[in-house]
Amino acid sequence: MAIKEQILENLGLKDGFFVQYFRWLAHFVTGDFGTSFVSGASVSLLIKERLLNSLILFVCSFVLIALFSFFLGLLSAIYKNKFADIFINFSSFLLASLPHFYIALVLIAIFSVYLNVLPSSGANELGFSGVGAKFIILPTLAIILPHLGANVKFVRDRLNQSLNADFIQTAHARGLGRGKIYLFAIKHASTDIVYYFATLVAGVFAGSYVIESIFSFPGIGKLSLDAVIAKDYPVALATILLTAVFVVFANLLAKIFAILADKRNL
């Protein structure tokens, strides 16, 4: 019992609830998240070691989601009701129906087990040159593919609305070329499309948690889930709260952008 009492005393768990809470809050706002129950290391240091990896994965995934969604949505709108449109819509719907973890396992089975061309785990330190870059390919694909379905459909529908607008019909009547007409339609729909992609920031980042665990990717998501399983409460609390702050901040920025881009939202 003496050892237990000493541990409780060292952790400050014998103080009152409000004393513990405000002490933790004061440390949290200064970047001191405490010490891991499992490893004994500083939680801030554990997060710092993995934050860059998660940011690299997020940036790669988000940029590719935006590019592929816009390109496929534009292609689908240009060839409306033709084979390309039907194929893109069917493929997008199929991908949107599959959960992230299932797609991740399929990618591992194909590229790591059957073809043996990409690693399914083993990443320690990432880099865009050298060996580290190959470890990010499969996790990025596993995040991208499920997001394409709804995104491609949104871009397609929004571009079709623009192409059916009165000013586009006027441009057709005046004999403007197809290229210029599509540029006008893209410009008209750009505010809604950019705002829509801005709202995806939080979902893409938070959705990478499971993917990081499946691929043993050394990021914040894997750190958080491992901490939850091991009941390492300081690490779990810090990573979850940081993710929540990021989600709120990302949504706030998206709304501010929408207000600045379109005064009708005021």
Q: What is each PLM-predicted segment?
A:
Residues 19, 34-37, 103-104, 119-121, ...:
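Short, hydrophobic secondary-structure boundary micro-motifs
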Residues 28-32, 114, 118, 204, ...:
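A short secondary-structure junction motif
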Residues 47-84, 129-266:
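Alpha-helical transmembrane segments of integral membrane proteins
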Residues 1-22, 115-135:
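Hydrophobic alpha-helical transmembrane segments of membrane transport/permease proteins
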